[in-house]
Amino acid sequence: MKNTVNLDKFVELKEKDLQNIQGGEIRQTHNIFFNFFKRR
């Protein structure tokens, strides 16, 4: 459960980053992480 909470916080931070910095690289990283999150 601990990992899930950390992931949620991490995703929140990433979304904030996405809003601040609209870059392709960050988007790609977020997508990879999102796919990994969906798998589990």
From Swiss-Prot:
Enumerate the GO terms in the molecular function aspect: pheromone activity
- Taxonomically, the superkingdom here is Bacteria
Question: Any idea where this protein resides?
Answer: Secreted
Which region is the signal sequence? none
GO process annotations (BP): establishment of competence for transformation
Give any Gene Ontology cellular component: extracellular region
- Family according to the record: Belongs to the ComC family.
Write down the NCBIfam families for this protein, in alphabetical order. Answer: bacteriocin_sig, ComC_Streptocco
The protein's job, in short, is:
Acts as a pheromone, induces cells to develop competence for genetic transformation.
What protein name is recorded for this chain? Competence-stimulating peptide
What taxonomic lineage is listed for the species of origin?
A: Bacteria, Bacillati, Bacillota, Bacilli, Lactobacillales
Gene for this chain: comC
